[in-house]
Amino acid sequence: MKFASLSVFFPAYNDAPSLPELLRKTFAVLDAHVADYEVIVVNDGSRDHTAQVLDALVRELGPRLRVVTHAQNRGYGGALRSGFAASQKEFVFYTDGDGQYSPAELPRLMECVGPATGLVNGYKLERHDPAHRVWIGSVYNFCARLLFGIRIRDIDCDYRLIRRELLDRMQLTSTSGTICVELVRKLELSGCGVAEVGVSHYPRQHGSSQFFRIRSLATTFVQLMKLWVRLVLLA
């Protein structure tokens, strides 16, 4: 039986080289496994030819592919918030537009959905990144568990399937990568069922991550502390 209703979206920043293969694979998976779906790409102020690539892909793949365009880069949190706001189906799945996760594993997340399930979160079976990124990711996961009581094993794995009605009830405010902590913390506090699935992680083939630049790391740290004050200290 096919999954009933699903929005899939990808935040994208200078991801033009990876988007064609990623989107074609996504449509193949959804055609086989989902009855009613839509695919959204949030072009977060890309400076490469992402816009032109997406225009061509809309012509190729048809009206089920929509593009949300930010004139200026709003950060990872801003891109996710736009993706959630644009999603119209019963469940929402998102992962990054850089191709480090494969849409082929999405059916494994869908299989975990039950009547009470609100979140199915992936976790990396093995991380294929440079050593400094692996170390920073481990520290970030540790801080998320220590400061926020996050129970999932990999907050840094952006491969998530979420019941949309839960998203509609919450107000997300983060503009950086801390949105993942805010999102999961609020979902766990809602009392919804949570499942976890191990997924493959692949080396990045094109471009570089925004998150691991000094300025981005500093912004993330400041926002993480502000989030802790609001969601934990003052809660």
Residues of each region from the PLM?
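N-proximal low-complexity "stem/linker" segments adjacent to membrane-targeting elements
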Residues: M1-A28
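Cell-envelope/extracellular polymer assembly enzymes that use nucleotide-activated donors
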Residues: S5-S7, E38, E182
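Acidic helix N-cap motif at the loop->helix transition within catalytic regions
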Residues: P17-E21, D48-L57
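Short beta-strand/loop segment that forms part of the nucleotide-sugar
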Residues: A35-G45, R66-H70
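A conserved acidic beta->alpha catalytic loop
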Residues: N43-Q52, G99
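Catalytic donor-sugar/metal-binding loop of nucleotide-sugar-dependent glycosyltransferases
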Residues: R151, L172-T175, V184-Y202
